[in-house]
């Protein structure tokens, strides 16, 4: 009697990351379905598409490769148990049973025939037509071979494949034999503790203009640091004692929220944090911690950035947060803030609920990225040194809040105020010219940029305006390209309106941000001009995702 199984379901982006963590490597090919999950909701068996399209590179024609294994056993608990059975000779026992027991042999042959038919049913019409015309030998492999690609249906290639086939809900005598043996030994088909469940964490950051929270599921990324991008954020990993064996994880957002708290408002004049800004920030942190608990996060890390760094009374804020929220507020350095933003762009993978076998990412090659994180009081530039592999960053005192306070006194701003502000931005950005253009750093060539990624509230809001969103949708915003002409037009439209009118602009997902958006857009425009870039890419990931990655590695944060 085969046991009950769940219906086939579409894979989510997070499922592929979980499967890679389960296997200890990335799964080749695409996941078509997940026929079985454990009671903790994690994949136990995945179904893979039978054709892999291989890019030959250097302009060569893209060619298909056969991928005959339909069902993969991914659950490490079951895989380990089946490995024990293999080591004890069960493949030989199954082969002997096939040879001497006619009913078992017929059932085994039927299983292989059915498996081949299921494989063919997965192939799309266009791929099938191509294989019939251009690759008939490959088509025969997919059509005529059995479980795991065996040519002889009387053979048993791998016990794990038969168990995967059986656990997917199919009649498979070898898989049934293995599972029955496990049951007799008291081994069940899932673990007790949910070992594959991603860590759910909360990252809260008190910025100069807003306080934000990200509740995220964090999935380990095995051996990632050992690959071609092995040195990405190595300083962060070393700072927290990582040997490089685990790798930078993937961060999948569960819930994201932000509140305009104005911590840095008026700081330039007084050198102190306003009482209203401190109170609003503490209240937001307290509320966000409650939200995080309700969503099941078990660890939290709370940080503050430029405003808290610059204020002479930041210790008062730290005390208030400790007393009201019973958590330590960590004021991070500008260098560490930049590294966390870089890590966030690399680790951020969109929403945990997103459907698809491949997680979205703007970080195709981290070595070619320039990350520009523009906040309320500062703008950080971060990239990799292509020679040393170290993360390099600089921070400039350019922020949407501080620029608005200093230059944009009228409502709407006058053209003279706008020109004076843009001139100041250009002057300050000269300090980043060599860094942005990848000129020698420490006597070595810095490398060539191919992608500028902008993160932060201004960038996300500009993307939301371009998409005319009613509410924040990180998966829509993530990867959105801001073109120079589009951004100039948006900038003109924003500063031409009074603040009250600006708040009504479609896509202004946080009306409270309307006051500082002309300055935020101007910073990004001037960065594009400095770099000679026709477009920049918006990332919904940033410092919060980087913080979540560090929490997921167990390097920081506290029990929630």
Residue ranges and their predicted role:
Residues 201, 262-297, 307-368, 383-386, ...:
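Helical "lid/coupling" subdomains associated with nucleotide-phosphate turnover
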Residues 120-197:
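C-terminal charged interaction modules
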Residues 199-221, 248-250:
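N-terminal basic/disordered segments at the start of proteins
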Residues 37-101:
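Aromatic- and glycine-enriched beta-alpha-beta binding-site module
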Residues 2-60:
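Short N-terminal edge-element motif at the start of the domain
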Residues 78, 82-136:
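An exposed acidic His-Trp-rich patch
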Residues 219-250, 351-364, 441-445:
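Intrinsically disordered, low-complexity terminal tails and inter-domain linkers enriched
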């Amino acid at each position: 009697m085969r046991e009950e199984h769940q219906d086939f379901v579409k894979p989510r982006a997070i499922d592929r990351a979980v499967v890679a963590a389960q296997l200890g490597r990335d799964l080749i090919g695409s996941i078509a379905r997940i026929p079985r999950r454990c009671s903790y909701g994690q994949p136990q068996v995945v179904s893979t598409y039978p054709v892999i399209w291989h890019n030959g590179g250097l302009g060569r024609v893209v060619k298909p490769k056969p991928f005959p294994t339909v069902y993969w056993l991914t659950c490490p608990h079951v895989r380990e148990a089946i490995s024990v059975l293999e080591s004890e000779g069960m493949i030989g026992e199954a082969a002997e049973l096939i040879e001497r027991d006619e009913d078992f042999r017929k059932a085994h042959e039927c299983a292989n025939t059915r498996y081949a038919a299921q494989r063919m049913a997965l192939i799309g019409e266009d791929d099938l037509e191509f294989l019939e015309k251009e690759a008939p030998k490959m088509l025969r492999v997919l059509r005529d071979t059995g479980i795991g690609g065996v040519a002889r249906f009387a053979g048993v290639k791998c016990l794990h494949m038969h168990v995967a086939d059986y656990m997917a809900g199919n009649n498979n005598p070898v898989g049934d034999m293995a599972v029955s043996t496990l049951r007799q030994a008291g081994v069940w088909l899932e673990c007790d503790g949910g070992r594959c469940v991603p860590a759910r964490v909360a990252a809260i950051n008190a910025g100069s203009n807003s306080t934000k929270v990200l509740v995220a599921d964090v999935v380990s990324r095995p051996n990632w640091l050992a690959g071609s991008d092995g040195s990405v954020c190595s300083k962060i990993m070393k700072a927290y004692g990582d040997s490089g064996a685990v790798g930078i994880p993937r961060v999948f957002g569960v819930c994201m929220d932000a509140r305009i708290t104005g911590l840095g408002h008026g700081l330039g004049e007084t050198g102190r944090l306003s009482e209203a800004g401190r109170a609003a920030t503490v209240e937001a942190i307290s509320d966000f911690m409650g939200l995080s608990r309700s969503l099941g996060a078990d660890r939290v890390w709370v940080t503050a950035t430029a405003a808290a760094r610059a204020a002479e009374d930041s210790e008062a804020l730290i005390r208030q947060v400790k007393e009201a929220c019973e958590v330590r507020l960590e004021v991070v350095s500008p260098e560490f803030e930049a590294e966390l933003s870089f890590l966030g762009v690399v680790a951020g993978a969109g929403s945990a609920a997103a459907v698809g076998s491949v997680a979205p990412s703007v970080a195709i090659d981290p070595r070619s990225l320039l990350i520009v994180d523009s906040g309320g009081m500062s703008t950080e530039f971060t990239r990799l040194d292509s020679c040393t592999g170290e993360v390099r960053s600089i921070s400039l005192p350019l922020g949407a809040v501080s620029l608005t306070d200093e230059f944009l006194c009228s409502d709407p701003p006058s053209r003279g105020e706008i020109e004076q502000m843009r001139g100041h931005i250009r002057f300050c950005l000269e300090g980043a010219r060599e860094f942005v253009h990848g000129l020698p750093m420490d006597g070595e060539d810095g490398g060539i940029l191919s992608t500028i990624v902008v993160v932060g509230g201004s960038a996300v809001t500009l993307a939301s305006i371009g998409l005319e969103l009613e509410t924040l949708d990180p998966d829509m915003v993530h990867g959105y390209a801001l073109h120079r002409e589009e951004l100039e037009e948006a900038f003109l439209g924003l500063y031409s309106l009074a603040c009250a009118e600006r708040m009504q602009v479609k896509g202004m997902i946080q009306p409270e941000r309307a006051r500082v958006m002309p300055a935020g857009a101007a910073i990004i425009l001037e960065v594009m001009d400095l770099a000679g870039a026709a477009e920049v890419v918006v990332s919904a990931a940033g410092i919060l995702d980087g913080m979540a990655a560090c929490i997921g590695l167990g390097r920081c944060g506290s029990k929630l």
